[in-house]
Amino acid sequence: MLQNFFWIGFWVIWVTGLFMILTYGWVIFFGAPYIPTLKKQQRQAIKLINLKKGQVFVDLGCGDGGLLILAAERGWKVIGYELNPFLALVAWARTRRFGRQVKVKFGSFWRADLSSADGVFVFLIGHYMAKLDSLISNQPHKRLKVVSNAFAIPRRKLIKKRGAMFLYQYPDNR
């Protein structure tokens, strides 16, 4: 009896570990592991980006959707990209009450169309920031505000910094 209990426990732990690796671990190869942006930092990002009602806000790596909710409450049209299937589902469930105002897209934001965006938020690992700059620079858009959490975009003119948040504008005069 004790031996059966051991094997059941072993398989539960093994399957849970495999699930965690598959849903959380592999995304590090595409940007960053899931580290939620603190509420205080979310509010700082919203204040920095300062969009008007009806403008389009994009969160590249929206995690559990916390920032999507804050943006939608301000009347912004919101798009969140998330590579982790579990977190994409959580973000979708948390933002359902906003209807078509919020879209959660499961997949890599490296292929995202940002041409309609007025503001973008991102929390990446430092060595991906130059790649992010290329992604944004190579897309057609009018004026785009970009807020980065914790990591600066190399060779970009910083507009403003609040706490760990960096505000940039595209196109800029480097």
Give the ranges of each region predicted by the language model:
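Conserved SAM-binding loop
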Residues: A91
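Conserved SAM-binding motif I beta-strand of class I
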Residues: K77-E82
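A short SAM/SAH-binding and catalytic strip from SAM-dependent methyltransferases
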Residues: D118-K131
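Conserved SAM-binding strand-loop segment of SAM-dependent methyltransferases
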Residues: F98-F109
